[in-house]
A protein has these predicted regions:
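C-terminal subregions of glycosyltransferases and related glycan-biosynthesis enzymes
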Residues: 47-178
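Conserved nucleotide-sugar donor-binding catalytic segment
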Residues: 1-66
Length: 178
């Protein structure tokens, strides 16, 4: 990013470690900063056990705070405002997977319960979406996803029981509409 753009949006916001980079990118995009995908490595970030990316709970809390801060802006364009439910849903699912991946299954459950309020489909379809999303996130990170390990965990079983209580019986039906 050019220095002028960083200064224009106020740089990194110290309220959001370790997700201040996500906040910065959102601010730049909202102000119209043009970007291009470079097909070469320009910066190398080494992930290790003590890096920010391996500290599950602080990363999760910070990313959710960034999302809340972004959508709490009163002057968001209507097109961006229309994406809020979808963005929140996807972000909460990613956070849940990330917490599962970093050894915080209780946190995973809490974030999937929050995602429940933003789901665009029935309860059963949401469950399928969550498993498919976890599989895709793991694949994109180059890690193995053990579906049986996830779905047989006490946290997942508790989540399913919670979901069944939250779901209307008619909502549990999956239709095959053409």
């Amino acid at each position: 990013f050019r220095r002028e753009w960083l200064q224009y949006v106020g740089g990194f916001d110290p309220r959001f470690p370790p997700a201040e980079d996500t906040n910065l990118v959102l601010k730049l995009a909202l102000k119209g900063c043009k970007t291009a995908w470079l097909r070469e490595i320009t910066v190398c970030y080494r992930q290790h056990e003590s890096s920010a990316m391996h500290k599950g709970l602080p990363q999760a809390h910070s990313l959710l705070a960034v999302t809340d801060d972004f959508f709490n802006q009163s002057d968001l364009p209507s097109g961006v405002r229309l994406m809020e439910q979808s963005v929140r849903y996807g972000t909460l699912i990613w956070i849940a997977w990330y917490l599962y991946h970093t050894g915080h299954p209780k946190g995973m459950t809490e974030y999937l319960q929050q995602a429940w309020d933003y789901r665009p489909n029935s309860g059963i379809e949401a469950l399928v979406t969550w498993v498919e999303s976890f599989s895709e996130f793991a694949r994109s990170w180059g890690v193995e996803f053990r579906i049986n390990e996830l779905t047989s965990s006490s946290e997942w079983q508790g989540l399913v029981q919670w979901m069944l209580k939250e779901t209307n019986p008619i909502d549990q039906t999956v239709t095959n509409d053409p």
